């Protein structure tokens, strides 16, 4: 998993609340269990005018040329609500997004994102609104998300602080998912197991 330390990227916004996981990645695309290949289906029902996904919706934000290559998504409260499908952060990451900034997230989506290297950043509603206004007013506007200092820098240079549990921050900074975190303690695990009496093994 790619570590997340500090990322500066083109920002795009979806100015909606309660964006659920079925909107992020509709159920008909959940047949795979590998993480790749979901980006093309991200926000399928909004991005495309047809079921096959051959006709892009020119009015949808992510389809507008000015946001091509965006890696930071701004949204409103309760992002990622709905089902617990891990495919949602898979699709967002496969599309090329590194961070999602919103006032709040659904709990399960929040945890799934961290476990898949996607940084969910909680800012106040007013701070998110300022970021959205700046991104809308300037083509090519970039935002910096620095996990080492837990700060977001807006296109105009305004800085906003955010918090993240230290355990989650450690995993993201070091590119560790739950399995990777366990393996990083391999020596201690082996030492502990070597001390277990044979009759208990």
UniProtKB/Swiss-Prot annotation:
HAMAP family (UniProt xref): LeuD_type1
UniProt xrefs under SUPFAM superfamilies: LeuD/IlvD-like
Function per UniProt: Catalyzes the isomerization between 2-isopropylmalate and 3-isopropylmalate, via the formation of 2-isopropylmaleate.
Gene3D superfamilies referenced in this protein's UniProt entry, alphabetically: Aconitase, domain 4 (3.20.19.10)
Catalysed transformations (reactions): (2R,3S)-3-isopropylmalate = (2S)-2-isopropylmalate
Listed name of the protein: 3-isopropylmalate dehydratase small subunit
EC number(s) given by UniProt: 4.2.1.33
Pathway: Amino-acid biosynthesis; L-leucine biosynthesis; L-leucine from 3-methyl-2-oxobutanoate: step 2/4
Matches recorded under PANTHER family: 3-ISOPROPYLMALATE DEHYDRATASE SMALL SUBUNIT, 3-ISOPROPYLMALATE DEHYDRATASE SMALL SUBUNIT 2-RELATED-RELATED
GO biological process, one term: L-leucine biosynthetic process
Gene Ontology cellular component annotations, sorted alphabetically: 3-isopropylmalate dehydratase complex
Organism for this UniProt entry: Shewanella oneidensis (strain ATCC 700550 / JCM 31522 / CIP 106686 / LMG 19005 / NCIMB 14063 / MR-1)
GO molecular function terms listed in the Swiss-Prot or TrEMBL record: 3-isopropylmalate dehydratase activity
Keyword Amino-acid biosynthesis: yes
Family named by the database record: Belongs to the LeuD family. LeuD type 1 subfamily.
Keyword terms of this UniProt record: Amino-acid biosynthesis, Branched-chain amino acid biosynthesis, Leucine biosynthesis, Lyase
Pfam family, one: Aconitase_C
Oligomeric and partner information: Heterodimer of LeuC and LeuD.
Enzyme class: lyase
Encoding gene, per UniProt annotation: leuD
